[in-house]
UniProtKB/Swiss-Prot annotation:
The gene is MED11. Component of the Mediator complex, a coactivator involved in the regulated transcription of nearly all RNA polymerase II-dependent genes. Mediator functions as a bridge to convey information from gene-specific regulatory proteins to the basal RNA polymerase II transcription machinery. Mediator is recruited to promoters by direct interactions with regulatory proteins and serves as a scaffold for the assembly of a functional pre-initiation complex with RNA polymerase II and the general transcription factors. Component of the Mediator complex, which is composed of MED1, MED4, MED6, MED7, MED8, MED9, MED10, MED11, MED12, MED13, MED13L, MED14, MED15, MED16, MED17, MED18, MED19, MED20, MED21, MED22, MED23, MED24, MED25, MED26, MED27, MED29, MED30, MED31, CCNC, CDK8 and CDC2L6/CDK11. The MED12, MED13, CCNC and CDK8 subunits form a distinct module termed the CDK8 module. Mediator containing the CDK8 module is less active than Mediator lacking this module in supporting transcriptional activation. This is Mediator of RNA polymerase II transcription subunit 11. InterPro entries: Mediator_Med11 (IPR019404). GO terms for molecular function: transcription coregulator activity. One of its GO terms (cellular component) is mediator complex. Belongs to the Mediator complex subunit 11 family. The modification N-acetylalanine is found at residue 2. The keyword Ribonucleoprotein does not apply. It comes from Bos taurus. Keywords: Acetylation, Activator, Nucleus, Transcription, Transcription regulation.
Length: 117
């Protein structure tokens, strides 16, 4: 039963974060609307900017806490039957291979230029 309450608490925290992101978007919309006016209300802009910054910092802190928690409980093992990890490793290896080829071609060009001179 404690597991369910912990899971529900985590879900509620994520819902709160989602609501906070909605507030961030509303603050940004209010600022954009105010900036589109010929004469802007400086105090309103300052209040909205402060609220925006505070909300972003709060969301960042809460998401970091969620990530830390998930890092602690995760075993690090890929899901049985999942090939995501293997595919990602292959993609990264191919990117490293492409990068090595690019650098080798640059070295070859440099050598050719030095030999021409």
């Amino acid at each position: 039963m404690a597991t369910y309450s912990l899971a529900n608490e985590r879900l509620r925290a994520l819902e709160d974060i989602e609501r906070e992101i909605g507030a961030i978007l509303q603050n940004a919309g209010t600022v954009i609307l105010e900036l589109s006016k010929e004469k802007t209300n400086e105090r309103l802009l300052d209040r909205q900017a402060a609220a925006f910054t505070a909300s972003v910092q709060h969301v960042e802190a809460e998401l970091s806490a969620q990530i830390r928690y998930l890092t602690q409980v995760a075993t690090g093992q890929p899901h049985e039957g999942s090939s995501y990890s293997s595919r990602k490793d292959c993609q990264m290896a191919l990117k490293r291979l492409d990068y090595a080829r690019l650098k080798l071609s640059e070295v070859a060009r440099t050598c050719e230029q030095m030999l021409e001179n």
